[in-house]
From Swiss-Prot:
<feature type="domain" description="GB1/RHD3-type G">
    <location>
        <begin position="83"/>
        <end position="305"/>
    </location>
</feature>
<comment type="function">
    <text>Probable GTP-binding protein that may be involved in cell development.</text>
</comment>
<keyword id="KW-0547">Nucleotide-binding</keyword>
<feature type="transmembrane region" description="Helical">
    <location>
        <begin position="729"/>
        <end position="749"/>
    </location>
</feature>
<feature type="coiled-coil region">
    <location>
        <begin position="576"/>
        <end position="596"/>
    </location>
</feature>
<dbReference type="InterPro" id="IPR046758">
    <property type="entry name" value="Sey1/RHD3-like_3HB"/>
</dbReference>
<keyword id="KW-1133">Transmembrane helix</keyword>
<dbReference type="GO" id="GO:0003924">
    <property type="term" value="F:GTPase activity"/>
</dbReference>
<feature type="coiled-coil region">
    <location>
        <begin position="372"/>
        <end position="396"/>
    </location>
</feature>
<keyword id="KW-0175">Coiled coil</keyword>
<keyword id="KW-0472">Membrane</keyword>
<dbReference type="GO" id="GO:0016320">
    <property type="term" value="P:endoplasmic reticulum membrane fusion"/>
</dbReference>
<feature type="transmembrane region" description="Helical">
    <location>
        <begin position="753"/>
        <end position="773"/>
    </location>
</feature>
<feature type="topological domain" description="Cytoplasmic">
    <location>
        <begin position="1"/>
        <end position="728"/>
    </location>
</feature>
<dbReference type="GO" id="GO:0005525">
    <property type="term" value="F:GTP binding"/>
</dbReference>
<dbReference type="Pfam" id="PF05879">
    <property type="entry name" value="RHD3_GTPase"/>
</dbReference>
<protein>
    <recommendedName>
        <fullName>Protein SEY1 homolog 2</fullName>
        <ecNumber>3.6.5.-</ecNumber>
    </recommendedName>
</protein>
């Protein structure tokens, strides 16, 4: 087979003087992983690091001799920045064939080399790794030599290391001596067969990138043409390939589907040292990605991210070591999942740390301005950082973990927003209450009982509407500035809930203002009506309720038109609600008037007695009536009583409507005693709520009035009888008095002292007569005589001699004496 010459050259990305966003993200991630908590400080050996020891143990932890592979890579930030922009090269060959020496010359590594003085035992144990190049863009693997005496016939380890190198290396060098070409074992052809078989295993589930196998012929002999050596090796390769039993999927597949081959040779290291060094330097150029003839073509790159190399190598080796089927796609997926998860966790932690300031702000009860902008920026930064660091991993896994990371970040931000929303809701509620209260306090100053103008309330109604609109606008703005896009749907209910609360507070404020306006109107109307109806209540005339109704109707017509206008302009009430409120207000005002009437119940006995006296005991001029024998006491008495009862009847019922005048609550006394059922009975059709005097109160008042009426009537009859006696003195008696008393009359006239005394006594009697005080004088004289007689008898009763006689003619009766005395005193009054 002809030599495979490179058709493309692979150009690595140059390091720029300024860091790209991806470089910054990786640097940030590296710094986080290099923190004292994540890195164990172990001295980095100059000879590279043994990643797999001779017993097959992977360098997963730090030891005294070497760091773990992870920490070794983390100590190379330049390499970490490469992402997938690096190449891996490994070398296979017999033990002590100069593999490590060749690598040191090619890549400026410092792998330990053979010291022949110490013997030709194996120098490289297991697998060693080092970074090469000024930009650390080449990973060099030095594998333990094959066919060593230490392993004897145990080929399992070299098989495992070969499979490991195939999994991670873009270029695999096979180091063999020229004089071993043609020998199956010595030329590592048996190892090549293993490589071919293992590589087919790697291709079973998914085609992996090709591997370039470079045969390095050592100790070239001048008399053997190199082309012949190349043909011999290719013939051996084809025989080996034909002997390999491929999976069914790859039957009849050519070898160049899986491998590319190149050949080179070097002179003897010791005999032709200068030539060896010169040709090695020429060969070194082919390991420069910038060279057009480079070995590192893109199709050979295994696409393992630099920051995931340690994890990938460990997973690959553990799988190989456990003799499990190696599934590179699964391993890459596992690596991607592991690294993406690790990066995701680190970014989540950084995100959590970055918003601690906002957490403290919210914890203190302070709202974060532009919450949405801040959180969106933090989330975008975190996701961008995640994408930058994970861009070389499997896209499906990166996207899957990215979604998980977003959910974590969104969950954290959502918990912060819940607190933010709680504080905003509390603040907006406080603002609504405060501003509406200020407006309410302002229109409360309008209160004046003597004046009611609903137009003044309209200003504050408009102010409430304007304030509500401003608060709703500010709430929407604040909410929009606080709600991240991913929470928009979830928070609609919260937004609408607060808007609803604002509306409820506004309706409550309007309702309270309408209530204040209604109360203002009620007080105004009360203060207007009271002075106008009080005189009617005091006058106690038959047309009292008619006059009161006229006042109420007049005031209601004017007043409630104003109130209705106020409701229309200052509230959001509809027509039916306004009518209902007007109706309630009328009822309230009528109840106030009713209470005013009820309060006068205490004065009712005085008003009724005054009414009776004004008709019965005083004449039309308001002077005390002088009863003459011709006066009709009975007719006047019944007239006074009936009119007094009419007044009582007016106060029994709240006659605010015209048809209320038909109800009667008192009865005529002329038919005898008052039956109790006539008082307790409620007139048919009467409204119990309009009752002012209940049946018990009416009963007590009627009984009291009955006594008052009877006393007045008896006094009038007595005075009339006295006047009749005065007019019944016979004429002959007057003539006899003059005839027999003529001498005494002359004696009085001739005696100045008796004359003056007679004038005084006569004048007093005349005045008493003119003033109709005869009855009073009579009663008083009777009272004095009675008291004198009673005192005399009681005194004689104390003398034992007269006691029996006095007891017979003057029995002792204290109650009678008291009653007669009381009656005499009453008549005297």
């Amino acid at each position: 087979m002809d030599e495979v010459s490179p058709t493309k050259h692979f150009t690595s990305k140059p390091l720029l003087p300024t860091k790209t966003p991806r470089d910054k993200a990786i640097s940030h991630y590296v710094n986080a992983l290099n923190s004292p908590r994540n890195v164990v400080k172990t001295e980095i050996p100059e000879c590279g690091i043994q990643i797999i020891d001779g017993d097959g143990n992977f360098a997963s932890t730090d030891t005294r001799e070497r760091p773990s592979l992870k920490n070794y890579i983390l100590s190379k930030p330049e390499f970490l920045k490469r992402g997938m922009d690096y190449n891996a090269v490994g070398i296979l060959g017999a033990q002590s064939s100069g593999k490590s020496t060749l690598l040191n010359y090619l890549f400026n590594t410092k792998f330990r080399i053979l010291n022949e003085v110490m013997g030709r035992s194996r120098t490289t144990h297991g697998v060693w790794m080092a970074l090469s190049g000024k930009e650390s863009n080449i990973v060099v693997f030095d594998l333990e030599g094959t066919d060593g005496s230490a392993r004897e016939d145990d080929y399992s380890f070299e098989r495992k290391t070969s499979l490991f190198s195939l999994s991670v290396c873009s270029v695999l060098m096979v180091n063999l001596w020229s004089h071993d070409v043609g020998r199956f074992q010595a030329s590592n052809m048996s190892l090549l067969k293993t490589v071919f078989e293992l590589n087919l295993q790697l291709f079973v589930k998914e085609e992996t990138p090709k591997t370039l196998i470079v045969f390095v012929i050592r100790d070239r002999e001048a008399d053997t043409p190199f082309d012949q050596i190349e043909r011999d090796i290719m013939e051996d390769i084809m025989r080996i390939w034909d002997s390999v039993i491929p999976p069914e999927k790859f039957i009849n597949s050519p070898i160049n589907r899986f491998f590319d081959f190149q050949f080179t040779s070097l002179p003897h290291y010791e005999h032709f040292y200068e030539n060896f060094v010169e040709e090695v330097n020429l060969m070194k150029k082919k390991f420069d990605p910038k060279n057009k003839e480079t070995y590192f073509l893109p199709q050979y790159n295994k696409e393992i991210p630099a920051d995931g190399l340690s994890c990938f190598c460990e997973q690959i080796w553990e799988t190989i070591k456990d003799n499990k089927d190696l599934d590179l796609p699964s391993q890459r997926e596992m690596l991607s999942r592991y690294r993406c998860t690790e990066i995701s966790n680190q970014i989540y932690k950084e995100f959590n740390d970055s918003i601690k300031g906002e957490m403290k702000t919210l914890k203190k009860g302070n709202i974060i301005e532009e919450f949405k902008k801040i959180m969106t920026k933090e989330i975008d930064t975190a996701i961008e950082k995640y994408k930058e660091v994970t861009e070389r991993y499997m896209e499906s896994i990166v996207e899957e973990i990215e979604e998980q990371l977003k959910k974590q970040l969104y969950g954290l931000v959502e918990s912060l927003f819940e607190r933010q929303a709680e504080l905003m809701e509390k603040a907006i509620g406080k603002r609504v209450k405060g501003e509406f209260t200020i407006i309410r306090n302002e229109y409360a100053l309008l209160y004046n009982k003597k004046e009611f103008n609903p137009m003044k309330y309209q200003k504050y109604s408009q102010e409430l509407s304007r304030t509500k609109a401003v608060i709703e606008r500010d709430w929407r703005k604040q909410f929009d500035e606080s709600v991240p896009k991913f929470l928009a749907e979830k928070t609609k209910e919260k937004f609408n809930s607060v808007c609803k609360d604002i509306g409820i507070a506004y309706e409550d404020a309007v309702s309270k203002m309408a209530e204040v306006m209604k109360q203002h109107f009620g007080d105004y109307l009360e203060s207007t009506i009271k002075p106008k109806i009080t005189p009617y209540l005091e006058a106690c005339k038959k047309d009292m309720w008619k006059n009161i109704r006229n006042v109420i109707n007049t005031q209601f017509t004017n007043g409630f038109n104003k109130l209705e206008e106020g409701f229309k302009t200052c509230s959001n009430m509809n027509k039916d609600t306004i009518e209902e409120e007007i109706k309630k207000s009328k009822i309230d005002i009528l109840n106030i008037i009713k209470e005013l009437v009820i309060k006068r119940k205490t004065e009712l006995p005085y008003l009724l007695e005054r009414k009776f006296n004004n008709i019965f005991r005083f004449d039309n001029k308001g002077l005390p009536r002088k009863w003459e024998p011709t006066d009709d006491v009975d007719t006047l008495y019944f007239t006074a009583r009936d009119e007094t009862e009419d007044i009582l009847d007016m106060y029994c019922y709240f006659r605010i409507e015209e048809n209320d005048d038909q109800f009667k609550f008192t009865i005529n006394y002329r038919d005898g005693d008052l039956p109790s059922e006539s008082i307790e009975a409620l007139p048919e059709g009467a409204d119990e709520d309009k009752i002012i005097l209940n049946h018990q109160e009416r009963k007590e008042l009627i009984e009291t009035l009955n006594e008052f009426f009877e006393k007045g009537y008896l006094i009038a009859l007595r005075e009339k009888e006295n006047s009749e006696i005065k007019y019944q003195i016979p004429l002959y008696l007057i003539v006899l008095v003059i005839f027999f008393g003529f001498d005494e009359f002359i004696a009085i006239l001739t005696n100045p002292l008796l004359f003056i005394l007679t004038l005084i006594i006569g004048g007093g009697i005349y005045i008493g007569y003119k003033l109709n005080l005869g009855g009073v004088a009579k009663n008083y004289i009777q009272y004095l005589l009675s008291m004198s007689l009673s005192s005399t008898m009681e005194y004689l009763r104390t003398i034992p001699f007269f006691t029996p006689l006095i007891d017979k003619i003057w029995p002792k009766d204290d109650n009678k004496d008291d009653d007669s005395t009381e009656e005499t005193q009453e008549e005297t009054k």
